[in-house]
UniProtKB/Swiss-Prot annotation:
UniProt catalytic activity: di-trans,octa-cis-undecaprenyl diphospho-N-acetyl-alpha-D-muramoyl-L-alanyl-D-glutamyl-meso-2,6-diaminopimeloyl-D-alanyl-D-alanine + UDP-N-acetyl-alpha-D-glucosamine = di-trans,octa-cis-undecaprenyl diphospho-[N-acetyl-alpha-D-glucosaminyl-(1->4)]-N-acetyl-alpha-D-muramoyl-L-alanyl-D-glutamyl-meso-2,6-diaminopimeloyl-D-alanyl-D-alanine + UDP + H(+)
Protein name per its UniProtKB record: UDP-N-acetylglucosamine--N-acetylmuramyl-(pentapeptide) pyrophosphoryl-undecaprenol N-acetylglucosamine transferase
Species name: Orientia tsutsugamushi (strain Boryong)
Lineage, highest ranks first: Bacteria, Pseudomonadati, Pseudomonadota, Alphaproteobacteria, Rickettsiales
One example of a Gene Ontology biological process annotation: cell wall organization
InterPro entries: GlcNAc_MurG (IPR006009), Glyco_trans_28_C (IPR007235), GlycoTrans_28_N (IPR004276)
């Protein structure tokens, strides 16, 4: 049985696609080894995966003296760990999903002449992936017009989309004509602080206007804001569920008519897979502003709506929600556009693995 290393860390956006591919590869008879870092360890709780998992202790590089020295020591230690992992497991192929956690594994893969594939979830190629373009067998991407991709490597590009976990591979049947309207608020794997005030204040305006909808809110909030957000919805007499992370996120999508969310890679792949109409508010300081490009890719396809954080206010958000609540035909057509964007990314990426596996 051939071993495949899947590596990615830092955020759920790098981890969850690796898990999704791991599920597909296991079904094809591969031995899967998932490598991530301590920042992603919390996302593995309450999930039961049968493949091996290794958690690396990675730290970001600081500009201050002692912290910078410590960071370099940790990076060196990670490279040694990477050497041991590659040497002892002899993977046939490495698939890297971004984040600087990939570096120690890819470097050792190059050292041992193990082929590797890069996967970019965002519409802008990340720094870690750019570092290893020259040596990669293939560069798999979500968007055909991915930015920051040097023309000399365009021949390596394969459009696969971003894999999503099995639990998220279905299309819900939503009744957009229902007067029971559920709104899903998600800030990505790390939550979003601005939503903790923006959304409740928009809902306050919604409650005070004339309509005949029963509104339910499912809100993923930053942990320290949970009590505040709950209190706001309670005061408004709005049925709500608030948590810092939903392990059963598929159920939340399934029962929601509209989402308000960031535009990270994982979120984008999930709303496409589940055909979830969404108002996208890109994180303004995301690396290379990739979330804005992600959101525009959705909006340009009329598969969602993009409102930049610099312009959004509770009143603007309220008006958008209110308009969409009263426009079931528009929500249904948006859902249809998302259906048209769906591709079987897990299968396509696994096919690339099959192609480049060492025989």
């Amino acid at each position: 049985m051939k071993t495949i290393f899947l590596v990615g860390g830092g955020t759920g956006g790098h981890l969850f696609p690796a898990i999704a591919l791991g599920e597909e590869l296991q079904e094809r008879g591969y031995n899967v080894y998932l490598i991530t870092d301590t920042r992603c360890e919390k996302y593995l709780l309450n999930f039961n995966y049968s493949f091996k998992i290794h958690i690396m202790n990675m730290v970001s590089i600081s500009n201050t003296g002692i912290k910078k020295l410590y960071a370099y020591i940790r990076i060196l230690a990670a490279c040694i760990t990477g050497f041991k992992l590659v040497y002892s497991n002899s993977p046939s192929l490495i698939v890297a999903f971004g984040g600087y956690t990939i570096a120690p594994i890819i470097i050792n893969g190059i050292l041992f002449r193990i082929p590797f594939i890069l996967h970019e979830q965002n519409s802008v190629l990340g720094l870690a992936n750019r570092l290893f373009l020259r040596y990669a067998k293939a560069i798999t991407v979500t968007f055909a017009n991915t930015l920051n991709l040097n023309n000399r490597y365009k021949h390596k590009v394969i459009v696969t989309g971003t894999p999503v976990r099995k639990a998220l591979r279905f299309t819900p049947k939503r009744n957009f004509n229902s007067k029971n309207f559920q709104l899903l608020v998600i800030g990505g794997s790390q939550g979003t602080k601005i939503f903790s005030t923006l959304v409740p204040n928009a809902i306050k305006l919604l409650v005070n206007c004339d309509h005949d909808f029963k509104i339910t809110i499912v809100h993923q909030a930053v942990a320290k804001d949970i009590n505040y957000v709950k209190a706001m919805y309670t005061e408004l007499n709005i049925e709500h569920e608030v948590s810092d992370f939903f392990y059963n996120i598929a159920d939340k999508y399934k029962n929601s008519h509209l989402a308000i969310c960031r535009a990270g890679a994982s979120t984008i792949s999930e709303i496409i897979s589940l055909c979830q109409p969404a108002i996208l508010v890109p994180y303004p300081v995301s690396a290379q502003n990739h979330q804005l490009f992600n959101a525009k890719a959705i909006a340009d396809n009329k598969a969602g709506w993009c409102i930049e954080q610099s312009t959004i206010t509770p009143h603007i958000l309220f008006e958008k929600i209110f308009t969409l609540m009263q426009s079931p035909t528009l929500l249904a057509s948006t859902e249809l556009k998302l259906r048209e964007m769906k591709i079987n990314a897990e299968n396509l990426l696994a096919n690339v693995v099959d192609k480049f596996i060492v025989t």
